[in-house]
Amino acid sequence: MLVTKLAPDFKAPAVLGNNEVDEHFELSKNLGKNGAILFFWPKDFTFVCPTEIIAFDKRVKDFQEKGFNVIGVSIDSEQVHFAWKNTPVEKGGIGQVTFPMVADITKSISRDYDVLFEEAIALRGAFLIDKNMKVRHAVINDLPLGRNADEMLRMVDALLHFEEHGEVCPAGWRKGDKGMKATHQGVAEYLKENSIKL
């Protein structure tokens, strides 16, 4: 489990948003001001994967406005990533997504993030990494279960709230909601006002 630990850094080829290939793309050199969202999908040209990739891509600006870059990874080569980007959505492609697509052809990144499944493909892992390279949130889904990009945005908001105010974010917390002081009195006050909504 990587939560609370430093995210494994890596250097690998990546197809960038402008379709150029960076042969030495490094996670640590591509964080946003506040961190990054690193997410894995099993394989290009498959089924649930394009829905997740398009969903994250549609929210790239939302993540960037909060200071987080989105970075995607699969075990495919940069050539396969490029071909998938250049396949129209109506033909099962992903179109011109704007975030970097890392080529984990050695499977070492998937292995380091503990998402490598049967030494073949990555499970649907997503990691919220802060500006200090610390993993603050992780979710790993089985192959048939797609992830929710809006939930990752909610977790980004929660982390930013905690960093700014020092308050923890209770169950179901959304941006604009009250946080909670991490004390016995803080939880008692919060539950008195909010337990019915939980």
UniProtKB/Swiss-Prot annotation:
Catalytic site:
C49
Question: What species does this protein belong to?
Answer: Helicobacter pylori (strain ATCC 700392 / 26695) (Campylobacter pylori)
Per UniProt, the keywords (alphabetical) are: Antioxidant, Cytoplasm, Disulfide bond, Oxidoreductase, Peroxidase, Redox-active center
One GO molecular-function annotation for this sequence? thioredoxin peroxidase activity
| Subunit | Homodimer; disulfide-linked, upon oxidation. 5 homodimers assemble to form a ring-like decamer.
The record describes the protein's role as:
Thiol-specific peroxidase that catalyzes the reduction of hydrogen peroxide and organic hydroperoxides to water and alcohols, respectively. Plays a role in cell protection against oxidative stress by detoxifying peroxides.
Q: Which catalysed reactions does the entry list for this protein?
A: a hydroperoxide + NADH + H(+) = an alcohol + NAD(+) + H2O
Instruction: Return the protein name.
Output: Alkyl hydroperoxide reductase C
Name where it's found. Cytoplasm
The principal localisation class reads cytoplasm
Identify the EC number(s).
Answer: 1.11.1.26
Family per record = Belongs to the peroxiredoxin family. AhpC/Prx1 subfamily.
GO terms of biological process kind: cell redox homeostasis; hydrogen peroxide catabolic process; response to oxidative stress
